[in-house]
From Swiss-Prot:
Belongs to the DAMOX/DASOX family. Optimum pH is 8. InterPro entries: D-amino_acid_oxidase_CS, DAO, FAD-dep_OxRdtase. The keyword S-adenosyl-L-methionine does not apply. This is D-aspartate oxidase. One of its GO terms (cellular component) is peroxisomal matrix. Keywords: FAD, Flavoprotein, Glycoprotein, Oxidoreductase, Signal. FAD binds at I13, E42, A63, S64, G68, R308, G338, Y339. Monomer. Optimum temperature is 60 degrees Celsius. It is an enzyme of class 1 (oxidoreductase). Its EC number is 1.4.3.1. It comes from Talaromyces thermophilus. The lineage of its organism: Eukaryota, Fungi, Dikarya, Ascomycota, Pezizomycotina.
Amino acid sequence: MPPRIIILGAGIIGLSTAVELQQRHQHRSAEPRPSITIVSAELPSQPSEWTEDPRCRPSPDYASMWAGAHYRPIPGATPQLQREAQWAMDTFRRMRRIARDAPEAGVRMMPGIEYLEDSPKEYGRLRTGDRYAGEHDEFRVLDKAELPEGVAWGCRYQTYSLNAPHYSRWLLDRFLAGGGQIVHRKLERLEEAFTLFEDGSQPLVINCTGRNFDQDDKMRIIRGQTVLVRNQFDRTITRQNRDGSWIFLIPRPFAGTIIGGTKEPGDMEVKPRMETRLKLLENCVRAFPEFVDRLEDFDVVLDNVGRRPWRDGGLRLEEERIEDGKTVIHAYGAGGRGYELSWGIAKEVADLVLATERSKFECRVSENLK
């Protein structure tokens, strides 16, 4: 019987991890390839399905379906941010390859522009030609003459933007085409994963649930609301206001542009607020008139509300041994950076999985030689 891996959650971390594990095992011949199963209460779907059948509409807790999503680097000012910066650059490298080799995936390379009304010291140290998003990112600090009124610092670089529901579905299709299995089921506790299959196997469980079944005191919910419009744009722009709020444009390949956004800690409201939509559109007209300069010119498609699973101290990524020799690898709590960090996290999870498998394989060989 091949070893069994169970991945809990079909968000961007779970999907990326599943595909990464499949690809890594293709190059290993000394050990049997594992059976990989994703167990999730919800699965990726397209917005066109949401309008045709409301039952297909994702819940706000399935945050990966409601994401922008683009890559905006954050300088590594703390050990956790330095770790995330490496994951982000690993992801940038992979996304660039996907954009080149699989245009149907919904990932597109484009210019990224940032404007900061305040300039933290970690940004002030950056110089044109530095590596910001990743290798060959054409990073350039903007001259003062290029900055809008009220902006203290700005930059331009090459980044990616993606269509979150489309890309997630593309990943799921790749996983299934590679022999992966799906169990469409909601679990109440992590321990249930070990009894899903009655074949006597001892699965390795990877916890990509986002919130860890609400069993982690460090977890917080941050509500985000954005607006999807049909209006098209050719670059992604982010402006950080002096009060810490943000205004951003995220082109969505095949489907318009995302305008955002909000960060509302502890707010569990699932319905979009119309006053928030109006404020987002007004802010966009004021900050980015080169995109749309009149409210009446917006062609609104959809309001997005997602509840981001944010964790104090950063995402939890570690192996845990629990009773009876059971192994869990945790990878949850990425907050609003799931897509930006996805392939870097998946790579590190896969490293842990392969190390665990290697150890078990060597133990079996040793036992057989006795």
